[in-house]
């Protein structure tokens, strides 16, 4: 089985880093599986600064150090994709209603990733690129790879 590589939408990253309920547990399960090498996770370089701004409530100095600490931990197993001028121009020329979605789709296609994980039900369909939430991603892995990710109760 080849390791799957997926791009995470910002909402999934916020669910995990911000422990946003009720979505945190599914995002946490995704991060744990990635941390032990089950699949590769990707985010864009632009998402890094977006996350600092959002999670520090607009850049509040007292919150920034903790946000940076969480992002450094995430970077232990999360790949970051650069955003090129060509990517930015493609996003600017896109007719998608959400520019971030257009950029993420462009990056996922450029990197030849296997899927995009998002909670955005309005994320447009992309030919040849599954777009799903965390729960559907694990169901997809069960169907396509025969792998079941369940938490062990100790």
Ranges and model annotations:
Residues 1, 5, 110-154:
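Acidic, PIN/NYN-like endoribonuclease modules and their adjacent C-terminal/linker elements
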Residues 78-121, 148-149:
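Active-site neighborhoods of divalent-metal-dependent phosphate/nucleic-acid chemistry enzymes
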Residues 12, 47, 87, 104, ...:
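Alpha-helix capping/helix-boundary segments
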Residues 43-47, 100:
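Short, conserved alpha-helical segments within structured domains
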